[in-house]
Amino acid sequence: VMRLVGSEMCIRDRLCVVLVIFSIVQTKIVHYSSLAYFPVTFLAALAMERFCMSSPSEKGRVPKGLKMALFTTAFLIAAVFIALPFFMKNTVHFAGQFGNEFVKASLLADVNWTGWEMLPGLVLLAGLGVMFWFVRTKRPIAVSTTLFVTMTFTTSLAVTVIFPKVLQHTQGAAIEFYQSKATEDCYVDHIGGKSFLDLFYTKKPFPDNPNHADSYWLMRKKTGKPTYFVIRIDRLHKLEGYDGKMVEIGRKDGFVFYERIENE
């Protein structure tokens, strides 16, 4: 028992550290929060184990606050999944309400939302109804099984039918450009923020040139290769004062693409 209590405290401390650090850092990348996956999973499994193995007098009884939090959160997630395809199919009507130019352009990206994207939300809603029935009849094993099965199918469906289309809206144009340069001997750089997309999708081997990731060198020095830059439309001000020559070669869904022209 003491070992379990000590492990639980250690896991809780780790989760708190991750949450605090992730709240402080400015660059919000999912990899930074991945350390929270194990503590969250452990604590959830521990709570379910206690729920299923509770004493006969307490068996199947869920604290009112936990029950309310669980069903409210699940219902809100299901509602978002169900409403999202209708929202995304009609972005032309309200994209102008957003002040950020990148958000506007991203929402207006040509992505085919069919309506089937609501399926994860419907599965979650159905599972929520079944689980509510089992909670009322105090059947903890059935509650746990329904929860696990519902979340497995909901997550799998969301990753399959929703997330790829969200990716097309937010980063699709940039990824398409990077992939078009994968077979060209060139430099590609992202201006105005940190990104790994140019490194991954251009499929470039690690270069011998130590300046390959130096934006100042790529923008102002002689590179000897075609040099391309990608920047979000709401960050074009970062190019103000640039004394070199760049030619805009395209823009799409909130991204602007430039090629640097070197002086002879």
Give names to the regions the model predicted.
Residues S7-E8, R12-E264:
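Membrane-embedded architecture of ER/inner-membrane glycosylation machinery
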